[in-house]
Regions:
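Short, charge-rich amphipathic alpha-helices with coiled-coil/heptad character
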Residues: 1-11, 45
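Hydrophobic alpha-helical segments, principally membrane-spanning helices and signal/leader peptides
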Residues: 3, 21-23, 41
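Generic secretory/membrane-interface signal
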Residues: 7, 19, 48-50
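Amphipathic alpha-helical coiled-coil segments
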Residues: 10-24, 28-31, 60-63, 67-70, ...
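Short E/K-rich amphipathic alpha-helical oligomerization segments
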Residues: 29-51
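A generic membrane alpha-helix/interface feature
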Residues: 43, 54, 74-77
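Short, glycine/alanine-rich amphipathic alpha-helical segment
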Residues: 46-65
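Short acidic DE-rich linear segments
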Residues: 78-83
């Protein structure tokens, strides 16, 4: 793979990451408005309590976890672009 092809592929990956992050941030923002708390505070309060089976909370937690992974992936691709 040539250097230009690597840059193009990496740029595409960055765009995919940014799109996924945008969607997840919208989901998380709507849940934070609904429950009136920030994600980190809300999940910190849930630690040590029985697992909530409310589908909204589960979806919120999964989205929050996925957001962390997408941000890590984005950072890795941005690091490649710097080379």
């Amino acid at each position: 793979m040539k250097y230009d092809e690597i840059k193009i592929t990496t740029r595409r990956e960055i765009n995919i990451c940014e799109h996924a992050i945008s969607k997840l941030e919208k989901i998380i923002a709507s849940m934070e408005r609904k429950y009136g708390k920030g994600s980190k505070d809300f999940f910190r309060e849930l630690e040590g309590t029985p697992h909530p089976y409310d589908s909204d909370i589960v979806h919120w937690y999964e989205s929050f976890s996925a957001l962390t992974r997408w941000k890590e992936r984005l950072a890795a691709h941005q690091e490649i672009m710097k080379l």
